[in-house]
Amino acid sequence: MAEPLLQLTRVTRRFPAGDKDVVVLDDVSLSIDAGEIVAIVGASGSGKSTLMNILGCLDHPSSGSYRVGARETSELESDELARLRREHFGFIFQRYHLLPHLSAAENVEMPAVYAGSAQAQRRERALMLLARLGLSDRAGHRPSQLSGGQQQRVSIARALMNGGEVILADEPTGALDSKSGHDVIRVLRELNALGHTVIIVTHDENVAAHARRIIEISDGRIVGDRLNPHADGADAASGASGDAGPQRARRLSAGVGRFAEAFRMAWIALVSHRLRTLLTMLGIIIGITSVVSIVAIGEGAKRYMLDEIGSIGTNTINVYPGADWGDSRADAIQTLVPADAAALADQIYVDSATPETSRSLLLRYRNIDVNALVSGVGERFFQVRGMKMAQGIAFGPDEVRRQAQVAVIDENTRRKLFGANPNPLGEVILIDNLPCIVIGVTAAKKSAFGDTKNLNVWVPYTTASGRLFGQRHLDSITVRVRDGQPSAAAEQSLTKLMLQRHGRKDFFTYNMDSVVKTVEKTGQSLTLLLSLIAVISLVVGGIGVMNIMLVSVTERTREIGIRMAVGARQADIMQQFLVEAVTVCLMGGAIGIVLSLGMSFVFSLFVDQWKMVFSAGSIVSAFLCSTLIGVVFGFMPARNASRLDPIDALARD
């Protein structure tokens, strides 16, 4: 004798009610063979719906055994039970339980999505089933556009999507008029004739009369189990349905299909509540805009400061006489000489070196007298300091060798001495009674350190030493380190060379790289501090996302129950709500980045000294941050959704 398809042995189901348990099913034993059409009849509260839920693996016995084929359901995990519902059972509910935002075809396709069927195959089968049930012209209609009988036929098509070896119909005609109810019963009998096992739960004796076997239940006990000799036809000869579901796609394709469905459902849910979605995203938008903008402003400010430092000579090392800044004996030390600069310039780590000596002297041009800082420098001075010429040229090695009486002046000196004359080249000025020809004017530069009003004049250091200052020693030497050479190592080598030349430590160095590092470190610290403040708004936005997702789970509890009934696993439900949370956050992140880019334009209208500098890294980080917020703050609502009991979820309005 063949093993029963469904077999319950001494099944009891209790539900807690305060301090006591209410027994809904009491010691029920029942077997149903493949291919039968069975009616379970009883009054309201008799336990017939609970029995159907246990038969469909939506609920579980408190005690006793329930076997589907050779499988004991009490030994199965939740995902294995979902697979049983997905591959063996098809549910037809009294209230249809169609998702209102999906079309008829999309509702029918749902079980195949969770079964991993390819999109084209499941759409083809859904249309075939709807056509078979006389709904080919209603495939694109939503449930609200269908009559009750049409909605129930869509529900039947959904039950058949994956094959529907066992059809469980809970009061299938309860909400229909007599004609529609008769049509539904006719369809169920036809399905039984095709090999489907059909179980009808009803309180209507007229509906039960169409079944070959009638099981009566009262107060949780089976009080009758009889064959119905008045039913037309006979049960199907074979329990195997000739209507197999669509072929499964490969695992990767199935996963992609489920993810695409989750994303589509997330999009539908977000669009259907536009204002709520916008308000939910607002915290994320503000947070991402703040973080990206602050990082861009900080990067722009840092680059601007580094450029300004570059204007006074980056990658340079200055050598001064004395032990350190403020050394009282520094003026008496006269060992720093031009030969030291020449020796340093020959080192492989040095790009160029220039001696420097300076005094404040009187300048005269015609009847105009002014005080200016006169500096004697080498021919590489302007290269070392990164200074450009607005007019004329700088002096070269020949002028240095000849102690030439030539001078380069800055823009401030040009304005003071020459006023409206835009071209002072070739004019002769007196520097402390030494006539010098102006051969160049340096370009004016705006500085973050303020626009200096000092007057500066540069002459060859040989001219300054021999003709102006009357001294052979230098005030300082500026060394420009070759590109690619580590500044710290160059400073160590420079110090070693100077010690060898002087025989003692009568000098000290000042590395501009330390200024650069200080600026970079300060900029990074400020950016980090401001970013942490901005991140607070991201956290607040994330909490907002979590709150709204919890509300969404509550609102869509019945939808979750429907999806579980048609075979969705806990992971599928969790994925759907996680995708929704991540989608909200990614949309907020994208809008935040766009707003930040727009802010850079507005920023440039009010601040002309530097610009906001965006990097691909900061934008990618913003998207990753949005995704992380969606996952972290969407996890709890998604987990709550996945842990809902299918029966409780279906009972929610």
Curated annotation (Swiss-Prot):
Q: Name one GO molecular function term.
A: transmembrane transporter activity
Q: Gene Ontology cellular component?
A: plasma membrane
Q: Which SMART domains match?
A: AAA
Recorded hits in Pfam families, A to Z, give: ABC_tran (PF00005), FtsX (PF02687), MacB_PCD (PF12704)
What EC number(s) does the entry state? 7.6.2.-
* One GO process term, biological-process aspect: response to antibiotic
Q: Which residues cross the membrane?
A: 278-298, 526-546, 587-607, 616-636
Q: What subcellular locations does the record give?
A: Cell inner membrane
Q: What membrane topology does the annotation report for this chain?
A: Multi-pass membrane protein
Coarse class of the protein's main subcellular location: membrane
**Keywords carried by this UniProt record:** Antibiotic resistance, ATP-binding, Cell inner membrane, Cell membrane, Membrane, Nucleotide-binding, Translocase, Transmembrane, Transmembrane helix, Transport
Per UniProt, residues of the ABC transporter domain are: 6-244
Sorted alphabetically, which SUPFAM superfamilies does this protein's record hold?
P-loop containing nucleoside triphosphate hydrolases (SSF52540)
Q: Give yes or no: UniProt keyword Transmembrane helix.
A: yes
This protein's assembly is summarised as: Homodimer.
Task: Give the UniProt family note.
Answer: Belongs to the ABC transporter superfamily. Macrolide exporter (TC 3.A.1.122) family.
Q: What does this protein do?
A: Non-canonical ABC transporter that contains transmembrane domains (TMD), which form a pore in the inner membrane, and an ATP-binding domain (NBD), which is responsible for energy generation. Confers resistance against macrolides.
Name assigned to this protein = Macrolide export ATP-binding/permease protein MacB
Q: What species is given as this protein's source? A: Burkholderia thailandensis (strain ATCC 700388 / DSM 13276 / CCUG 48851 / CIP 106301 / E264)
Q: Which gene codes for it?
A: macB
